Amino acid sequence: MNKSYCIKLFSEIFSDSASKYRFCCHANENDTTKKYNPLNTTPFDYFLSPEMEQIRNDVLSGKRIQGCEECYLKEDAGHESFREQYNQGKDLPTNVESYNVDLKMHIFGTFCNLGCYMCIPFDSSTRRAELQKSGLKDFWYDMESADYTLEGPRNLGTKRYEEIEANLIANIDYIRILRFYGGEPIQMPRVWSLLSKIPKDKAKNIEVLISTNLTLTEFKGYSIEWIKERFKKLTLTVSVDHYGKKLHWIRYPINVFEFEKNLALYKKDVNYLNIAVSMLNVYDLKEIEQHYN
């Protein structure tokens, strides 16, 4: 395939915390598509729009597109880019295909039951409340490098979320993977609202990936086990920054015993442990690895 093609343009719908559609989490905005956002355009109306079709045609013809500068700069400097990593070893589609779309949208909320020290505040309601209470919110935002983070999280509102959810269900045959991240998805009502509305025969074709703190495994009659029984596959990416007393201090107010019990119970469903490296754990990384092995 040519040096501008990227599989993400054909297989991923991504929106960030500021309710902006982008080609992937590494991409900048594109002038032709930035008019679309989850507040005014449903996911598949954006993804199947004439503008997105033109962008896909452009990369198929070898044209570089606005928004993908980070990858192009890496490649021009002789380094491997995210684009090249994503394309590697994959069947590369040339159009939008059924059961091939990876949905990764920040539309389900930011509620989280922990206030982790390394957490970006727009990804955790608890951390955000703590920083606001302590007067450190502006200081934290000043440390962010991406412009979109300055805008903070946007609440879609119930009516708008229901419209988006209906659009996803209507186009469920396109979806291969549902990714839930930001906050604690297992404790978000909207996550379970979407999952429960997907017909059983369709769910069997869909993989679910959840980025979780794994402190809780159930929510109002739903559970991790319910997902495993209903969907094709469940994958858990588990956030963990230390162990024992240090874990409790960093990821306050985590119940370490319950967390490690859940981790052992769902070990086979975990693809990796996600560690936020900071001065609070950087000298203990080998020790942490040995503990969880």
What are these model-predicted stretches?
Residues 167, 190-197, 221-226, 249, ...:
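A short acidic, amphipathic alpha-helical/loop segment
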Residues 67, 75, 111-115, 122-123:
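Short pre-active-site segment immediately N-terminal to redox-active cysteine/selenocysteine motifs
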Residues 83-96, 133-138:
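Short cysteine/histidine-rich metal-coordination sites, predominantly Zn2+-binding motifs
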Residues 1-89, 101:
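Accessory C-terminal segments flanking Radical SAM cores
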Residues 279-293:
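Catalytic cores of alpha/beta
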Residues 100-111, 120-160, 173-191, 201-221, ...:
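Core AdoMet radical
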Residues 49, 89-96, 157-169:
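A Trp-anchored, charged/polar loop motif used as the substrate-binding/catalytic surface
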